[in-house]
Regions:
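Core segments of cupin and vicinal oxygen chelate
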Residues: 8-61
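Short, solvent-exposed loop/turn segments at the edges of secondary structure
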Residues: 52, 78-80
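Short aromatic/hydrophobic contact patches that present stacked aromatics
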Residues: 5-7, 82-84
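Vicinal oxygen chelate
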Residues: 2, 30-33, 44, 56-58, ...
Length: 142
């Protein structure tokens, strides 16, 4: 069965970001491969040796991949997309939202909406925008 997974790009702080996401999302970091670990026939500039070529985070319900931008490719930041998380309860959404907001920028405070008991938007300290839902509703409240 096909899977659709996000692949985030970073500018030298991928390892820190993925360790942060592992903790916040209660996930497991399965791969953290540096450019310096690539085969000898794939030369890497010394400036990129410690940067992450590929990171793979797994959770029972999703996977997240990431890497630092390759040598010679300028980092462009995240634009036009948002990662979204949906939790069964508003309390779970609040915990994750608060952790992502620490050192980040809240663009929409977590609050009740017609589609969820809680929804908010935040750009975390690594520049990744998130939408966090909790207690999804199938129909608007009356």
């Amino acid at each position: 069965m096909p899977q659709l997974n996000a692949y985030l790009s970073f500018d030298g702080n991928c390892a820190k970001a993925m360790r942060f996401y592992t903790r916040v999302l209660d996930a497991r970091l399965e791969a953290l491969i540096t450019y310096g670990q690539t085969p000898a026939d794939m030369p890497t500039p010394a400036s990129h040796a410690d940067r992450i070529m590929h990171a793979y985070l797994v959770h029972p319900d999703f996977a997240l991949m990431a890497g630092d931008t390759p040598p010679g490719i300028p980092y462009q930041g995240v634009s036009g997309v948002m990662m979204t998380l949906t939790y069964p309860t508003a309390a779970e959404a609040q915990r994750v939202f608060a952790a992502l907001a620490e050192g980040g920028n809240v663009t929409m405070p977590l609050g009740e909406t017609f589609w969820a008991d809680a929804f908010g938007m935040v750009t975390d300290r690594y520049g990744t925008p998130w939408g966090v839902n909790g207690g999804a509703r199938m129909q608007p409240p009356k």
